[in-house]
Amino acid sequence: MTATKQHKKVILVGDGAVGSSYAFALVTQNIAQELGIIDIFKEKTQGDAEDLSHALAFTSPKKIYAADYADCHDADLVVLTAGAPQKPGETRLDLVEKNLRINKEVVTQIVASGFKGIFLVAANPVDILTYSTWKFSGFPKERVIGSGTSLDSARFRQALAAKIGVDARSVHAYIMGEHGDSEFAVWSHANVAGVGLYDWLQANRDVDEQGLVDLFISVRDAAYSIINKKGATFYGIAVALARITKAILDDENAVLPLSVFQEGQYEGVEDCYIGQPAIVGAYGIVRPVNIPLNDAELQKMQASANQLKTIIDEAFSKEEFASAAKN
């Protein structure tokens, strides 16, 4: 994709709850001029495309249709939400093997179409499936991106904002590491309108230290809470994906928390995709933003990466995945 291209095309692979919510977000936020939707349930996809097109008189012109893999050849962005859903009591990492098989099949067909754009991965476990998308595609690491901790960071900012009584957009704070149980809050660099969070709390007494611990736990475990109540999470991640999509298609050079390839940005963290802030634009990841972590945070980053690496190494020791790797 070039930054000057006017007609922006997105292909969505996976028309489940996350995918259809993402498609709706693209329509209502006037993002892209063309949206093709791929799913094994073609009739459902056709119905969604028709339903979404009925909103266009209220938004902006857009071509929306049920697509095939051949339609990926000239897409600027392919968004992968296809995968087995996370069930109550199941961790994101429990999904690994079945979703790796789906990922391999999907990515192979997309690359065969002649696709030269950017992959944006949202299926879980997202850090591992972003890595496998990079391996199976043979693409440069900058053009394979995962949604990473974008939603986790949004949940964190919203929870802090609600606790201290400000707009979430005035809270600047990140969750880093795995999108999952080993993620961690970067407390050392959290701030409210430029005021360090700890300085803010000292001056305003909005919450004590135990309150912060409880707040992080609620953020980390938010998906489990939602899944237990309604079966799946999809609205929050859909809007996060729409935000990332806009940053790419509009060449924003926006700083967003994403699943980014690691090659020594942090000591002891290499050869995996994991959540950290990065600058993203029309050509994918421009560069990671390496927040200076304190010793405790760095240890958490290393532990999170080691957990992911153990699972990745085990998965790619199997012939069915190792033989398909191009990177």
From Swiss-Prot:
It catalyses: (S)-lactate + NAD(+) = pyruvate + NADH + H(+). Its main location: cytoplasm. Allosterically activated by fructose 1,6-bisphosphate (FBP). It is an enzyme of class 1 (oxidoreductase). Pathway: Fermentation; pyruvate fermentation to lactate; (S)-lactate from pyruvate: step 1/1. Beta-D-fructose 1,6-bisphosphate binds at residues 157, 172. The keyword Ribosomal protein does not apply. Transmembrane segments: none annotated. GO terms for molecular function: L-lactate dehydrogenase activity. SUPFAM superfamilies: LDH C-terminal domain-like, NAD(P)-binding Rossmann-fold domains. The active site is at residue 179. The modification Phosphotyrosine is found at residue 224. Keywords: Allosteric enzyme, Cytoplasm, NAD, Oxidoreductase, Phosphoprotein. InterPro entries: L-lactate/malate_DH, L-lactate_DH, L-lactate_DH_AS, Lactate/malate_DH_C, Lactate/malate_DH_N, Lactate_DH/Glyco_Ohase_4_C, NAD(P)-bd_dom_sf. It is found in: Cytoplasm. PANTHER family: L-2-HYDROXYCARBOXYLATE DEHYDROGENASE (NAD(P)(+)) (PTHR43128), L-LACTATE DEHYDROGENASE (PTHR43128:SF16). Homotetramer. This is L-lactate dehydrogenase. It comes from Streptococcus equi subsp. equi (strain 4047). The gene is ldh.
